[in-house]
Amino acid sequence: MFSKQDQIQGYDDALLAAMNAEEQRQEDHIELIASENYTSKRVMQAQGSGLTNKYAEGYPGKRYYGGCEHVDKVEALAIERAKQLFGADYANVQPHSGSSANSAVYLALLQAGDTILGMSLAHGGHLTHGAKVSSSGKLYNAVQYGIDTKTGLIDYDEVERLAVECKPKMIVAGFSAYSKTLDFPRFRQIADKVGALLFVDMAHVAGLVAAGLYPNPLPYADVVTTTTHKTLRGPRGGLILAKANEEIEKKLNAAVFPGAQGGPLMHVIAGKAVCFKEALEPGFKAYQQQVIDNAQAMASVFIKRGYDVVSGGTDNHLFLVSLIRQGLTGKDADAALGRAHITVNKNAVPNDPQSPFVTSGLRIGTPAVTTRGFKVTQCVTLAGWICDILDNLGDADVEANVAQQVSALCADFPVYR
């Protein structure tokens, strides 16, 4: 029998030490990984609730187990809030992750061997958009488009040429490292020209879309997916959205359950419901605008300090810094910044001479630092510190000096006050 007073402390101190160390790292380090953010304590409360005990295979009102009358209400709240937030007619809140959501879309709307046209991972796309190492690149005939290496922008004429040439069943629009605004009307035009479905993965910019600061793909896409963390600041999970289409809705539901998953994670769905409610609050737009302002301010500093920012700047929450001209690797830069308590991720850049495990670039994003309360002033200072480390890569004194300043800044802007 369990007690309400049961705690990890005193029972599994080795695990607790690792958990506490990670929480302290989050407080003491500046987080600039574009896909990371901090959830509210409300989201954490939902995820740590008794809902974790409930199995609920199926959908609200159509479960395979009894005792689901309360979790039905939880899922219904999440669905309705997601639809309201994005102007969707359909929402499935059960995918365990963004990759799970993408896999369900492919399972629902494609047959093995069908052709998909997606953005190359090497040019800013995502693994699930047809990369050879992903199931999306193994189960389907994946053709890849990229960016114009001179402008750093997607070449839509090239996308159209490839579409006409390969006649894809589906075109995938989305990215993990592209800093400019996607042209959804143009993607729709290309898809219609070749009779393809248009699938948009807006995982990185969903928060900006919800705030009205980035174009909403719903009017143009046959189906849209997103994660619920990143710019949405919710729990780690996935979401599928669409406009009204009974045939597609049935296929999507069947692909998620029983096609790809069994029981949904009801405690995570509750966390999603909380984050959707938070995103509907008036202050959410101001937060997202600050995310963009901070990213643009940081990118400007890198450009002024002589670093190449792919695409020449950013319209969203992230940007990619190429270190090719400096002869540096992303791996070494990532490690040096980590020693100064600044967390980024190494990232491939167009025409990268290095392997994906070394790379010649850094991806930098501002959602997490903005959640901490950083404004443009702090972000400009932070970008300067990063450039100082890159200018003097491997200099322990520079790293120590920056680490000391990072410590003071983190103390002024705690994650949880």
Swiss-Prot record:
It is found in: Cytoplasm. The keyword Disulfide bond does not apply. GO terms for cellular component: cytosol. It catalyses: (6R)-5,10-methylene-5,6,7,8-tetrahydrofolate + glycine + H2O = (6S)-5,6,7,8-tetrahydrofolate + L-serine. The keyword Repressor does not apply. (6S)-5,6,7,8-tetrahydrofolate binds at L121, G125, H126, L127, S355, P356, F357. Pfam families: SHMT (PF00464). The record marks H229 as: Plays an important role in substrate specificity. Pathway: One-carbon metabolism; tetrahydrofolate interconversion; Amino-acid biosynthesis; glycine biosynthesis; glycine from L-serine: step 1/1. It comes from the Bacteria. The modification N6-(pyridoxal phosphate)lysine is found at K230. It is an enzyme of class 2 (transferase). Its main location: cytoplasm. GO terms for molecular function: glycine hydroxymethyltransferase activity; pyridoxal phosphate binding. Keywords: Amino-acid biosynthesis, Cytoplasm, One-carbon metabolism, Pyridoxal phosphate, Transferase. HAMAP family: SHMT (MF_00051). Belongs to the SHMT family. Catalyzes the reversible interconversion of serine and glycine with tetrahydrofolate (THF) serving as the one-carbon carrier. This reaction serves as the major source of one-carbon groups required for the biosynthesis of purines, thymidylate, methionine, and other important biomolecules. Also exhibits THF-independent aldolase activity toward beta-hydroxyamino acids, producing glycine and aldehydes, via a retro-aldol mechanism. This is Serine hydroxymethyltransferase 3. It comes from Pseudomonas fluorescens (strain Pf0-1).
